[in-house]
C-alpha cells in the first residue's frame, strides 16, 4: 500500500478515505504535457518524491480497461521515457526497447 506517499498532495488523503472528490484533489491538468500539483503544505523534498513510481501519471483508459493486470502486461504497461517494456518474465527479467515516440 503506497497511497500514503501521495498525501502531500492537497486533499489526497481525504480522497483516499472517501471524504473528497477527484475534482477536489490538488491536481490540475493544464494540457497533454503539463500537470499542476498543489500541496497540503510546503514540501521541499517533493521533487525527490516524484522519482517514486507512485507518482507516475497514468492513462485512465488503460487502467480502467484492466484494473488488476495493466501494470504487468507489456502491451498495456504505460511508460513515458526513452524505453518501452516489450517482455516481462515475472521474477526473472524485464526487456525494454527504444521508444520511438
What do the PLM-derived regions correspond to, one by one?
Residues 12-24, 30-33, 39-101:
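Gly/Pro-rich hinge or "lid" segments in bacterial periplasmic/extracellular proteins
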Residues 1-5, 36:
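Aromatic- and charge-enriched surface segment that lines or borders ligand/interaction sites
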Amino acid at each position: 500500500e503506497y497511497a500514503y506517499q501521495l498525501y502531500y498532495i492537497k486533499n489526497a488523503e481525504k480522497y483516499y478515505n472517501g471524504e473528497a472528490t477527484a475534482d477536489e484533489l490538488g491536481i490540475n491538468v493544464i494540457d497533454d504535457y503539463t500537470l499542476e500539483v498543489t500541496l497540503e503544505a510546503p514540501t521541499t523534498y517533493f521533487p525527490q518524491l516524484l522519482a517514486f513510481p507512485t507518482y507516475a501519471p497514468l492513462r485512465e483508459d488503460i487502467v480502467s480497461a484492466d484494473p488488476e493486470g495493466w501494470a504487468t502486461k507489456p502491451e498495456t504497461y504505460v511508460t513515458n521515457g526513452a524505453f518501452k517494456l516489450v517482455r516481462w518474465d515475472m521474477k526473472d527479467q524485464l526487456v525494454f526497447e527504444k521508444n520511438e515516440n
